Amino acid sequence: MTTSHRPQLEARNGAKNIEYIPTSTQHARLLPGHKEVKYRNTKKRVLNRKVESTPSEEAKKRIKITGAEECSKDEEIQATDSSDEYEEEEEESEDEEALLEEWNKVKQERLDKKLREQRAEITAAQNEEVTKPQKHGGWRSNTVFGRKGTVNQSASISEHNSNGKGKYVNNITQSEYHKEFIRKHVK
């Protein structure tokens, strides 16, 4: 049987002790985790909007007292406000159009720059391929101990030794093979 992964505050295995007295000690894992229900914020917002949208008692009294005169004044004020809002909306839409045009220009410039860089990389790679004749003899031909075998290789070894290039070096980081490998493959 497995445990319930809860600490045993009073171990109950073994013989039952008559003098066993349970204590009032409680572990945090034995307590309930949640005691309140959480509500979504959207419901609170909807409730707040409903409360705000209902006309207050003061507004109702004011309408009854002042009558139609103030209502007509309010309508005139709202009409002027709506014309101001229309002008502001036009200005905002013009500003948005200008910003969109600038954004499109910036995007186009970035695209052109990327294309130029890619073309430059491609042409550079093609130039390297043309200028450097690819002579791939394998990695064994460059190693010190991989040159054993044929007479032609022994002749090439003596040529390397006379140049001072193919000498055996005890330190691998100082060997010509290592230097050539780093030059070719690590940039």
Swiss-Prot record:
Biased composition (Basic and acidic residues): 49-60
Gene Ontology molecular function, alphabetical: RNA binding
Keyword Nucleus tagged: yes
UniProt xrefs under InterPro entries: Cwf_Cwc_15 (IPR006973)
Stretches of the chain forming a coiled coil according to its record: 72-131
Superkingdom to which the source organism belongs: Eukaryota
Primary subcellular site in the record, as a coarse category: nucleus
Protein name, as recorded: Pre-mRNA-splicing factor CWC15
Origin organism lineage: Eukaryota, Fungi, Dikarya, Ascomycota, Saccharomycotina
Gene: CWC15
